[in-house]
Amino acid sequence: MQEFNTFSIVARCPRTGLLGVAVATAVPAVGSTCPFSRPGVGAASTQSWVNPYLAIAVLDGIASGKNAVQALDAAIAADHGRSLRQIGVVDHNGVAAAWSGSDCTPWFGQEVGDGFAVQGNMLVGPETIAAMSRAFRDSESCDLDERLMLALEAGDASGGDKRGKQSAALRIQGSEAYPVLDVRADEHPEPIPELRRILTISRLQLIPFVAGMPKHDGPAGAAPAEVQTMLALPPPLRPGGGGSLPAKNVSS
């Protein structure tokens, strides 16, 4: 079993109802394992000695009518490895909860606030959690993706994972079965600045495309003409740049 020594934040935007998770660690591809979200239900980050089924059980509990606190209590009680687990969850009403088992690697801890929870283990100290919470609270006027990104950056600047850095991820869930945004820096020496770079490009290139995708209450159709035109360009020529130009043909 892999221990993910991680700092993360889960949150709900009170203006839009969007749910989100942002997470960073010194293990590759954290976005494939720790963040979970479900439309109309909630969002969670499961970490330390990761149990994906813990996050699934919490979201199932919320879907059945429990709030985040009740669902987390029930899921933790059923997990025999609870002392090794760490998880943060927020539900669709903005109720947040977190758990840090007594056998998580120090320093570990959590902070639950209005509509958010921050948690981390194997950190340099409590300043990481405090900095992330402060950054989230102080950015109330920003969109949820920006607030979560700012919280990750604050955690990184305060020390973060005491082993170093390797991957980071940010996920935003709306009312559809697919996320509004799911961006990752899967393996990078500076994953949080790399995630910021990817987020900047994604806002200009990916989010307009996702906005035009079929909705559960709307017919399927092509992306808007302006999005099609943009995406027909080589990546470096699009807004925000990125990617590479096409390879030149080499005559034989």
Regions found by a protein language model. Give the residues of each.
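N-terminal nucleophile
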Residues: 1-252
